[in-house]
Swiss-Prot record:
A Gly-cisPro motif from one monomer fits into the active site of the other monomer to allow specific chiral rejection of L-amino acids. It holds the Pfam family Tyr_Deacylase. GO terms for biological process: D-amino acid catabolic process. An aminoacyl-tRNA editing enzyme that deacylates mischarged D-aminoacyl-tRNAs. Also deacylates mischarged glycyl-tRNA(Ala), protecting cells against glycine mischarging by AlaRS. Acts via tRNA-based rather than protein-based catalysis; rejects L-amino acids rather than detecting D-amino acids in the active site. By recycling D-aminoacyl-tRNA to D-amino acids and free tRNA molecules, this enzyme counteracts the toxicity associated with the formation of D-aminoacyl-tRNA entities in vivo and helps enforce protein L-homochirality. It comes from Psychrobacter cryohalolentis (strain ATCC BAA-1226 / DSM 17306 / VKM B-2378 / K5). It is found in: Cytoplasm. Belongs to the DTD family. One of its GO terms (molecular function) is tRNA binding. NCBIfam families: D-aminoacyl-tRNA deacylase. This is D-aminoacyl-tRNA deacylase. Homodimer. Its main location: cytoplasm.
Length: 151
């Protein structure tokens, strides 16, 4: 499982011109599911995202300006967006190969479980719409982007 996380000032997801999910300051997390992923790896990924320290610590003078707080500590939102393209193999040729991505029906079920788990761990969770052609709007803060992997 891979997740591209971004520290954002704002992020939203729209489908057919209708906003389906939005957050203010927080983390926009694109989630890519692979063949070997399961509920346990999904839970590990959510736990990692929620505790990954990518926000500045301006409360402690000794840590001023250092990324030392996680999304929960700053009271930010979490926007989860399914994105199978994160599983692409790009090392050969000029076209991505998506054979590592989980089949859509299985991925939809696992992504729903991932979202459900996230909502049990944190209050401010929003999502896109699985399988839809989504328009994602974000104001990246920093920019700070990290590619997380869980096996």
């Amino acid at each position: 499982m891979r997740s591209l996380i971004q520290r954002v000032k704002y992020a939203s997801v729209s489908v057919d011109g209708q906003e389906v999910g939005a957050i203010e300051q927080g983390v926009l997390a694109y989630i890519g599911l692979g063949h070997d992923d399961n509920l346990q790896s999904a839970q590990r990924m959510i736990d990692k995202i929620l505790t990954y320290r990518i926000f500045d610590n301006d409360d402690d003078p000794a840590k001023y300006g250092k990324v030392d707080k996680n999304v929960q500590q700053v009271g930010g939102g979490l926007l989860l967006v399914s994105q199978f393209t994160l599983m692409a193999k790009t090392d050969k040729g000029r076209r991505p190969e998506f054979g590592s991505a989980m089949a859509p029906d299985m991925a939809q079920a696992l992504f729903a479980q991932l979202v459900d788990y996230a909502k049990t761990q944190y209050l401010t969770v929003a999502t896109g719409q699985f399988g839809a052609d989504m328009q994602v709007l974000s104001v990246n803060d920093g920019p700070l982007n990290f590619l997380l992997e869980v096996h």
